[in-house]
From Swiss-Prot:
Ribonucleoprotein keyword on record: no
Name recorded for this polypeptide: Beta sliding clamp
Gene field: dnaN
Organism, scientific name: Mycolicibacterium paratuberculosis (strain ATCC BAA-968 / K-10) (Mycobacterium paratuberculosis)
Localization: Cytoplasm
InterPro entries named in the record: DNA_clamp_sf (IPR046938), DNA_polIII_beta (IPR001001), DNA_polIII_beta_C (IPR022635), DNA_polIII_beta_cen (IPR022637), DNA_polIII_beta_N (IPR022634)
Pfam families xref list: DNA_pol3_beta, DNA_pol3_beta_2, DNA_pol3_beta_3
Keyword Zinc-finger applies: no
Function field: Confers DNA tethering and processivity to DNA polymerases and other proteins. Acts as a clamp, forming a ring around DNA (a reaction catalyzed by the clamp-loading complex) which diffuses in an ATP-independent manner freely and bidirectionally along dsDNA. Initially characterized for its ability to contact the catalytic subunit of DNA polymerase III (Pol III), a complex, multichain enzyme responsible for most of the replicative synthesis in bacteria; Pol III exhibits 3'-5' exonuclease proofreading activity.
Keywords, alphabetical: Cytoplasm, DNA replication, DNA-binding, DNA-directed DNA polymerase, Nucleotidyltransferase, Transferase
Single GO BP term: DNA strand elongation involved in DNA replication
Gene Ontology cellular component annotations, sorted alphabetically: cytoplasm; DNA polymerase III complex
Amino acid sequence: MDAATTTAGLSDLKFRLVRESFADAVSWVAKSLPSRPAVPVLSGVLLSGTDEGLTISGFDYEVSAEAQVAAEIASPGSVLVSGRLLSDIVRALPNKPIDFYVDGNRVALNCGSARFSLPTMAVEDYPTLPTLPEETGTLPADLFAEAIGQVAIAAGRDDTLPMLTGIRVEISGDTVVLAATDRFRLAVRELTWSAASPDIEAAVLVPAKTLAEAARTGIDGSDVRLSLGAGAGVGKDGLLGISGNGKRSTTRLLDAEFPKFRQLLPAEHTAVATINVAELTEAIKLVALVADRGAQVRMEFSEGSLRLSAGADDVGRAEEDLAVDFAGEPLTIAFNPTYLTDGLGSVRSERVSFGFTTPGKPALLRPASDDDSPPSGSGPFSALPTDYVYLLMPVRLPG
């Protein structure tokens, strides 16, 4: 029998709730659903009503998502319906109360004068969601979102290289280090959190796409709880749990070896520069208009001046000069403009500091603080401590 029409596992679930909270929860869970599910039921969201309210769940054996919302439960029970269809419907409804109930082998959804009847799927075929590991620590939700966003930008997208598609999460007591790389750039963020145990030590690799989605749209509220386990069991479940403010998700950890990244970070620079982020970003986008997609933008640094240039005679040339604080020998270096603006957008500060060694070796970008004083002399210059670095490989200069 077709899974969409079977009545097995249906209940008399009936509830009423406000559209806004329902739409937010369904949309969040639906984003975790696979676009091409291995079996049809994995495209569904499970709605479960109890005396405590309504729980909306999704799971594809890799990623799970669960959200709890307040609802008037007239009749408890569970039902499974298409997640993306339900999400599209509730987001388009007017801001009025929603009445939802099981009607035979279908569900009815009414809101204002709008009425929908949707087919159901077999609840008994739906997998059980994994249990969250023990809590490992907590941190503010806004800090979590910022830090993940800063490193996820550098993660690889090639699934044939799984070690590059993840974010390395290293935990040592109250310190967390996040790192990601696609071989062309490396982003590292260090932050402080509230560890469940002061002597906890762990290092895991988490899928960057899932973690970025959770950080970007997932947990609202004051704190996020990360669950990898506790004591000697940290990471042993092969799961990372993220929870807070009525939402929780899990993702399987990647079983791959992340590159040894610390040895890539230079301890000193032969030249350094500090410049306004917004002005530099705007100038890069402007001169890159004459460059083919992915072509280089050249940066010529000298005392007090930066000249940006791109293009060639056959496609057109562009140049722009900017003021810069620069110390060291004059330097010409070139970068992929997209990777460069990604890094500038991730430093989250008004000014950015560049550290260079040679035109053929990676440049280091970090936030420039108000306390940074322009260096003097000809170098070398020691790399200053920072909680965020973006290491970017240059591209080969012509000739």
